[in-house]
From Swiss-Prot:
HAMAP family: RecA. Belongs to the RecA family. Gene3D superfamilies: P-loop containing nucleotide triphosphate hydrolases. It holds the Pfam family RecA. This is Protein RecA. GO terms for molecular function: ATP binding; ATP hydrolysis activity; ATP-dependent DNA damage sensor activity; damaged DNA binding; single-stranded DNA binding. It comes from the Bacteria. It is found in: Cytoplasm. SUPFAM superfamilies: P-loop containing nucleoside triphosphate hydrolases (SSF52540), RecA protein, C-terminal domain (SSF54752). Residues 326-348 are annotated as: Disordered. Its main location: cytoplasm. Can catalyze the hydrolysis of ATP in the presence of single-stranded DNA, the ATP-dependent uptake of single-stranded DNA by duplex DNA, and the ATP-dependent hybridization of homologous single-stranded DNAs. It interacts with LexA causing its activation and leading to its autocatalytic cleavage.
Length: 348
């Protein structure tokens, strides 16, 4: 047994000498066993994710039909990162980012790094450079479907380019996955959906860009509109369902229901009323909502408005709900610079 241990120790020393300290270790000796997260900016989504937010150093895919709220979900996460003093980058391959809308959602557009690349290769090279810097906490690519390979852009309109985009994504993710994990960057890939022709049974919907992103993603979120939210005859927004279809860090298939209001994004008050009523932090009797035996509104919309006007009570309820769901922020790490991440460029 001693000979085997001595041989193992020798092998470990050789590996560390060749590949550097920390290249191999016992899992129990790893200092960062808990998954550190950054809030998604939505209480309901934080709860559905199971760990209180997006896991750092992982790849997230957000997909769904057009105008379902995919970019809104990503922008809320950027606002949350910036609120904690972190740096965020947005690679706008669709050339469709609305700065005014982003500002309404709480994004500091003066500090947001923005790139509008010409080709898919350029977009992914920029993404790699940003991640390797070790100084970017969140990177959003909008969208995978718009990452057009250079050969397709330079070719004729009717030319066939079978599998080019899938190969591009597969190669990029092979390069990015390791360095994303080391740098603790959250990489959010927004994706569209397409339909397979001739599918008789099962779901005909697929996401562009091949299968690689499905495999490399730690979390996959499906965003879909459920119903319109009306005030009288005016449509004010949409009730949206966000389904966690894949989750490597917590149980999957949980669903978050949020109100996405036009021009405002996710209504924090709306999801707070729903989640608080679910765990009896807010009491619902008939159509009346009450907190600590004090009525806060008749009907959901009035309760939302009350919380919007009384931010101290809203924050108190939010804290209690997070404690009930055991996502009180104990797994949050400060977004500060460290020697390990900032030396990623030097190691190459």
């Amino acid at each position: 047994m001693n000979d085997r241990q001595a041989a193992l120790d020798q092998a470990l020393k050789q590996i560390e000498k060749q590949f550097g300290k920390g290249s191999i270790m016992k899992l129990g000796e790893h200092s960062d066993q808990n998954i550190s997260t950054i809030s998604s900016g939505s209480l309901a989504l934080d709860i559905a994710l199971g760990v209180g937010g997006y896991p750092r150093g992982r790849i997230i895919e957000v997909y769904g039909p057009e105008s379902s709220g995919k970019t809104t979900v990503a922008l809320h996460a950027i606002a949350e990162v910036q609120a904690q003093g972190g740096t965020a980058a947005f690679i706008d391959a669709e050339h469709a980012l609305d700065p005014a809308y982003a500002k309404n959602l709480g994004v500091n557009i003066d500090e947001l790094l923005l790139s509008q690349p010409d080709t898919g290769e350029q977009a992914l090279e920029i993404a790699e450079a940003l991640v390797r810097s070790g100084a970017v906490d969140m990177l959003v690519i909008d969208s995978v479907a718009a990452l057009v390979p250079r050969a397709e852009i330079e070719g004729e309109m009717g030319d066939a380019h079978v599998g080019l985009q899938a190969r591009l994504m597969s190669q990029a993710l092979r390069k990015l996955s390791g360095v994303i994990n080391k740098s603790k960057t959250i990489a959010i890939f927004i994706n569209q959906i397409r339909e397979k022709v001739g599918v008789m049974f099962g779901n005909p919907e697929i996401t562009p860009g091949g299968r690689a992103l499905k495999f490399y993603s730690t979390v996959r979120l499906e965003v879909r509109r459920a119903e319109q939210l009306k005030q009288g005859t005016d449509v004010m927004g949409n009730k949206t369902k966000i389904k966690v279809v894949k989750n490597k860090v917590a149980p999957p298939f949980r669903i978050a229901e949020v109100d996405i209001m036009y021009g405002e994004g996710i209504s924090r008050e709306g999801e707070l009323v729903d989640m608080a009523a679910e765990v009896d932090v807010i009491n619902k009797s008939g159509s009346w909502y009450s907190y600590k035996e004090e009525r806060i509104g008749q009907g959901r919309e009035n309760a939302k408005q009350y919380l919007k006007e009384h931010t101290d009570i809203r924050d108190e309820i939010s804290k209690r709900v997070r404690e009930e769901y055991e996502i009180d922020g104990t797994n949050k790490e400060p977004l500060d610079e460290n020697e390990e991440t900032l030396s990623l460029l030097d190691d190459e």
